[in-house]
Amino acid sequence: MFYQDPFDVIIIGGGHAGTEAAMAAARMGQQTLLLTHNIDTLGQMSCNPTIGGIGKGHLVKEVDALGGLMAKAIDQAGIQFKILNASKGPAVRATRAQADRVLYRQAVRIALENQPNLMIFQQAVEDLIVENDRVVGAVTQMGLKFRAKAVVLTVGTFLDGKIHIGLDNYSGGRAGDPPSIPLSRRLRELPLRVSRLKTGTPPRIDARTIDFSVLAQQHGDNPMPVFSFMGNAFQHPQQVPCYITHTNEKTHDVIRNNLDRSPMYAGVIEGIGPRYCPSIEDKVMRFADRNQHQIFLEPEGLTSNEIYPNGISTSLPFDVQMQIVRSMQGMENAKIVRPGYAIEYDFFDPRDLKPTLESKFIHGLFFAGQINGTTGYEEAAAQGLLAGLNAARLSADKEGWAPARSQAYLGVLVDDLCTLGTKEPYRMFTSRAEYRLMLREDNADLRLTEMGRELGLVDDERWARFNEKLENIERERQRLKSTWVTPSAESADEVNAHLTTPLSREASGEDLLRRPEMTYAQLTSLAAFAPALEDEQAAEQVEIQVKYEGYIARQQDEIEKQLRNENTLLPATLDYRQVSGLSNEVIAKLNDHKPASIGQASRISGVTPAAISILLVWLKKQGMLRRSA
């Protein structure tokens, strides 16, 4: 039976990728359907109760700059906010927030249920309707069929999910939820490369059984950071501390003595786990010289007694988990309320996707989130937004859009996935970006909000706030450029008190701000350069733009040089055996990856600069040298 109304876009799955995809498509005016197996778990934090971190916070800010949901939700649900790398340069500073799971899920659901053009329907999806290599709809568990011009798969760890606790295992999408086995089998019938990955989660502890009096506290920052460019600290709920404990030799002995009961070490788990979030058994074995590992005890919410022990993800049996937990200081009498576990699941090779996250083989079918081999809420949300907006554009007969590596961490993420693929869960770091100084958290809106407006993602309120900020930055920079102080002026003594070397010539406000010892706050506290901007975001931009102007200009030059070849297009049907001069290895890799551009080709392992030169010459001779806009 077909549902009476067709849709423009169908989203399958209501996690962090699915909710952003649904919101993006609906914001762009397309009739959107979000199918989920359980409406009550929309926006569920399946693992750690945190948003942000190094690289990840950058993605959240970019999603927000494009009108997305995640930053707004965490501002309403964050119970501890910190700036990581606060003492380092602005390129690597990152916002991180501890979340109240219930408040976060509530904020997401309220946003979804109040979004025009979006319908939510509770039913698991078991099949796709594919006609002539084009997806045209989805079939639910009860046989109800929905038609649409585009479908976005955001199914997380649910595809043929298998949960492991010790040597026991059972089918599951995550603890308490069924897997999606029929859909997994259906997708395996399509011409797509599929493999298995693994992730894990720690046991949850009853806070009433922990002796916090012997543990060090870790508080959030004051003043409190804010995630959304539209947010403010008054939105944050009550703030609470986290606590720190450590593993010890007793902990490590328990783990080493029970490795034969670990599904990972016993060879029961085939999927590869996340390199940068290893299980505690992995850490103990890989870092055998370490006699302790730091564990953060993170509250899961203001109305919950559950504690998330960040750092002891494990799939060891329950009795061993109890021994591990009780071996640590403050946890001698602790009780576990949910056991830790590992989960294996299907993922599909992202090299089979276009940069828009549309399948190269099934027209109108998009993939986003863990199904593409990534790990983390933030990576999923960013992909969801991109897939959702491109599904909306496809349904409106418009060309797809994807940011370049030089524009956004989202561009880095998608390019890495679509060009290189991944054999392990992919996590974003600032080190993955070549142009970190340009891709900062603080300027995500300056980089992306104008494009978001053109795409139809940014509403009038955000657009007005953005333009006001731009005007404030420009006006303040002009004021500082045109305000001068001379060594003989009355105000010189006050200025010199803040300088390591006194004034020897006339200096503008911008000249003084370029000095490493002078901050914007100090400068505008001086009578000659007061008052400071009330707009804190604009004030931050003024300081960063002035202090790093030379470095930013140099990096912009690098980007422009790189873009000359980056955007040279490669035909999707090109057989690289036609290109004389390429080695057999290069031919095989290019035919396997099918890069969309010279830039993508240059990042494939084994494709040398010499091979790129040969390819450019051949394209020119064939009259095929074309660049994307």
From Swiss-Prot:
InterPro entries: FAD/NAD-bd_sf, GIDA_C_N, MnmG, MnmG-rel, MnmG-rel_CS, MnmG_C, MnmG_C_subdom, MnmG_C_subdom_sf
Residue ranges crossing the lipid bilayer per the database entry: none
The protein's required cofactors: FAD
Binding positions (FAD): 13-18, 125, 180, 370
GO molecular function: flavin adenine dinucleotide binding
Keyword hit for Transit peptide: no
The keyword Signal appears for this protein: no
Sites where the protein binds NAD(+): 273-287
UniProt function note: NAD-binding protein involved in the addition of a carboxymethylaminomethyl (cmnm) group at the wobble position (U34) of certain tRNAs, forming tRNA-cmnm(5)s(2)U34.
Cited NCBIfam families: mnmG_gidA (TIGR00136)
Family affiliation: Belongs to the MnmG family.
Protein name, UniProt field: tRNA uridine 5-carboxymethylaminomethyl modification enzyme MnmG
Lineage: Bacteria, Pseudomonadati, Pseudomonadota, Gammaproteobacteria, Enterobacterales
Gene: mnmG
